[in-house]
Regions:
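Hydrophobic beta-strand scaffold residues
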Residues: 35, 127-128, 155, 179, ...
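Phosphate-binding site of ATP-dependent enzymes
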Residues: 196-277, 298-305
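A glycine- and small-aliphatic-rich helix-loop capping segment at beta-alpha/alpha-beta transitions
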Residues: 119-128, 197, 202, 327-329
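ATP-binding N-terminal substructure of ATP-dependent carboxylate-amine bond-forming enzymes
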Residues: 1-134, 138-140, 144, 148, ...
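Short, flexible, mixed-charge acidic loops at enzyme active sites
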Residues: 50-55, 119, 247-255, 311
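Active-site nucleotide/adenylate-binding loops and adjacent lid/helix of ATP-dependent enzymes
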Residues: 3-7, 11, 19, 90-97, ...
Length: 352
């Protein structure tokens, strides 16, 4: 198949996406597909051949890419674009996507995981992988997700609010501690703070203003961090995350050796079943499709507290879903190919 692996874009998770996309593209090419990596925002800038020739490029336009410890400089990315346009679709992106049999969406965060790209592809009749635009948009909104799933699964107490800089001190004064402060629509734990003091709450709220005016302030739950991938609507083995320092933030997620990841997780069968049930319930309630990954904190008594679900989980060398798939006997190349074939089937059957 001709496959465009769409990555990059203008999200704070740009670098993670490019790492995922590079690995996905190489895996699909190794399985005989004509796969090519395309940056959503920059498109085919710098490529001298005809757009349709990317599928025959010897390397699929895949360079060597690893995730830096620091978040990307998006201003520099914008400045590097030759036409200086803010259009999320770069040069020839829609053109080559329309030529493909399917687009593997390897985007993370805004302009990719939030449903906007999926909606555009639906309008243009371009087949793509993963959940549709509505489920993607809902899952990106942490507050809306929790409101929809709270009747069915256990989740930490939370409140969502929009605020200005002038309101930060008052909000900090009335916040129950300890708590977790996070942007309402970010991924990769970017902007997330565990706050134990009023000052830490205020600092976290100040930082979150860089990511939009809405935050979620969540009750801090002490427990073990477990995550569960899902493929074709069925949960994969749970994985436990044990950061060597701090919590599972951006740096700990994407730097090899920064966290211990144990899969299958060393937990009782009863815990595994509760996690499986909760993950599949959230997936079903939000009407997601093909694959995703849900995040939980499990307390000492075995209660799983649902945190959020990611419709386009990372596929980097340190990412969790590939590890969980491997524990279920599914290799990385097979996982990528199953996502493609399951997505095409789901769209044909009207399930995505």
């Amino acid at each position: 198949m001709r496959i465009v692996v769409l990555a990059g874009g203008l999200s704070m998770e740009r670098n993670v996406s490019l790492s995922s996309g590079t690995r996905i593209c190489r895996a699909l090419r190794a399985r005989g597909h004509q796969a090519a990596l395309v940056d959503l925002f920059l498109g085919l800038e710098g490529y001298d051949g005809a757009p349709e020739s990317i599928f025959d490029a010897p390397d699929g336009l895949c360079g060597d890419f690893s995730v830096a410890r620091e978040e990307p400089d998006l201003d520099a990315v914008r400045a590097s674009r030759r036409d200086k346009s803010e259009n999320i679709f770069g040069k020839d992106v829609l053109r080559v996507c329309a030529m493909a049999d399917v687009v593997f969406i390897a985007l993370h965060g805004a302009c990719g995981e939030d449903g906007r790209v999926q909606a555009a592809f639906d309008l243009l009749g371009i087949p793509y992988t993963g959940s549709g635009y509505l489920g993607s948009a809902i899952a990106m909104d942490k507050d809306l997700t929790k409101r929809l799933v709270a009747p069915y699964v256990t989740t930490a107490k939370w409140r969502a609010l929009k605020y200005t800089a002038d309101e930060i001190d008052a909000i900090a004064d009335e916040t129950e501690l300890p708590c977790v402060v996070k942007p309402n629509a970010n991924g990769s734990s970017i902007g997330v703070t565990i706050a134990h003091t009023r000052g830490e709450v205020a600092a976290a709220l100040t930082e979150c203003l860089h990511f939009g005016a809405q935050v979620v302030i969540e009750q801090y739950i002490h427990g073990r961090e477990l995550q569960v991938g899902i493929l074709d609507g069925k949960a994969l083995p749970a994985i436990e995350i044990i950061p060597k320092t701090g919590f599972y933030d951006y740096a700990n997620k994407y730097q090899a050796g920064a966290a211990e990841e144990v899969c299958p997780a060393p937990i009782p069968a009863e815990w595994e079943e509760k996690l499986r049930s909760a993950t599949e319930t959230v997936f079903r309630v939000l009407e997601l499709s093909v694959y995703s990954r849900a995040d939980f904190i499990v307390t000492e008594d075995g209660t799983p507290y649902f945190l959020e679900i990611n419709t386009l989980p990372g596929m980097t060398p340190t990412s969790l879903v590939p590890q969980e798939a491997a524990a279920a006997g599914i290799g990385y190349g097979e996982l990528c190919e199953r996502i493609v074939t399951s997505s095409l089937r789901a769209r044909k059957e009207g399930r995505a």
